[in-house]
Amino acid sequence: PDHYTCAYDLAIMAAYLIKIGGEDLLNVTSLYDSYIREDTKQSFWLVNTNKLLKLYDGVDGLKTGYTKEAGYCLVTTAKRDDQRIIGVLMNESAPKTRNEEMCNLLDYGFNNYQQITLFKKDSVIEQHLVDKMDNLTIDVKCKKDIVYTKAKSADAKVSTKVNYKENFLPVKQGDVIGTLDVIVDGKTIATYDVYSDTNASKSTYLSKTIKTLKYLF
């Protein structure tokens, strides 16, 4: 009693589950049938109740469900061309109807939305000047693809902004030196860590003084 949720809640939970579970999770949820507990005396053959694994190209999870109050429910995820979509249906009248409606929902997602890659993993986002006197720059990189999803019909204005930590020198290769914001139509929709691809030391007061004198004389 008094235990409620909605499709949006389940979609958020599914996205987080995929994020932390990764391929280990999807390797299990994508199995249509398999022996369970093979190393025990209680091993048995289990057939996945998510029939979309064989009905819809790209489906690799997640969970079916049923209660009298909620009806036939389904949280599904499918991936095509590096774009992953999560669909949630609740209170369907029968498993067949649930499957048909989910196929329609996934079709709508793939037909109307696309994933745009702004920067590929390990690509240089920009070069950042860290010491004007030495003209020292470092390559700024991301450790994952930086992407966003847009409606195919939308003409969105997209930009990125790197926010650097203050006084991050000295820095080693791989250290986080700031964040990159993905901004769509003036609104920040995602934030990623960015890293230095270079070792860089901090100039001492003495070295700066010597360089200044050399510059003057």
What role is predicted for each listed range?
Residues 2-4, 8-217:
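Domain-terminus/edge residues, biased toward the C-terminal soluble/receptor-binding domains
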